């Protein structure tokens, strides 16, 4: 049930940076915005491309190699391997795609444009909220079932039918019938 929710409902707007920005500035932005990745617009000879830079890229390609993050451009560590999905993809499908492509982020594309991003972390964070909402829904449905099975609603339904039959017999005015129905609901 939870897994059938489309990613469109939980996606975030991606953060986009220019490829000539330093890794240091991108890392700082990622920490400030609490995101594990950014889209990078790279100006390559003869074409422009959109790539992704992740927190793991910064660690593996800059910090582990002891390169100065303020001197390395983000386009030098970004990857063109964007995994994209349509907005109606379900959470279950998104998780399967993440596992298949061994990625922690998916980019949502609509009409050829990137409109959102969803990360494994987003899916983990959203799970408790979804579970809480589902618990509320289940409790509400159980309450309705209890009312129906206790006869309370069916008794009221019968009373409304009796009131309506009284209307057919012209015993009560329309106003009297409305008043009786309102009193019944209260």
UniProtKB/Swiss-Prot annotation:
The keyword Repeat applies. InterPro entries: CBS_dom, CBS_dom_sf, Diverse_CBS-Domain. Keywords: CBS domain, Repeat. Transmembrane segments: none annotated. Residues 10-69, 77-133 form the CBS domain. SUPFAM superfamilies: CBS-domain pair (SSF54631). The keyword Metal-binding does not apply. Signal peptide: none annotated. PROSITE patterns: CBS (PS51371). This is Uncharacterized protein MJ0450.
């Amino acid at each position: 049930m939870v897994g059938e929710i489309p990613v469109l409902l939980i996606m975030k707007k991606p953060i986009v940076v220019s490829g000539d920005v330093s890794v240091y500035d991108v890392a700082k932005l990622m920490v400030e915005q609490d995101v594990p990745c950014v889209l990078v617009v790279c100006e390559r000879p003869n074409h422009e491309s959109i790539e992704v830079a992740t927190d793991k890229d910064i660690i593996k390609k800059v910090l582990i190699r002891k390169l100065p993050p303020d001197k390395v451009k983000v386009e030098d560590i970004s990857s063109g391997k964007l995994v994209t999905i349509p907005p109606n993809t379900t959470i279950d499908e998104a998780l399967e795609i993440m596992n298949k492509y061994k990625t922690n982020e998916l980019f949502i594309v609509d009409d050829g444009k990137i409109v959102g991003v969803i990360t494994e972390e987003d899916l983990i964070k959203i799970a408790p909220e979804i579970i809480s909402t589902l618990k509320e829904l289940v409790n509400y449905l159980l309450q309705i079932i209890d009312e129906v099975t206790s006869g309370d609603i069916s008794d009221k339904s019968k009373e409304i039918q009796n009131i309506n039959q009284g209307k057919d017999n012209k015993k009560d005015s329309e106003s009297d019938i409305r008043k009786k129905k309102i009193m019944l609901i209260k």
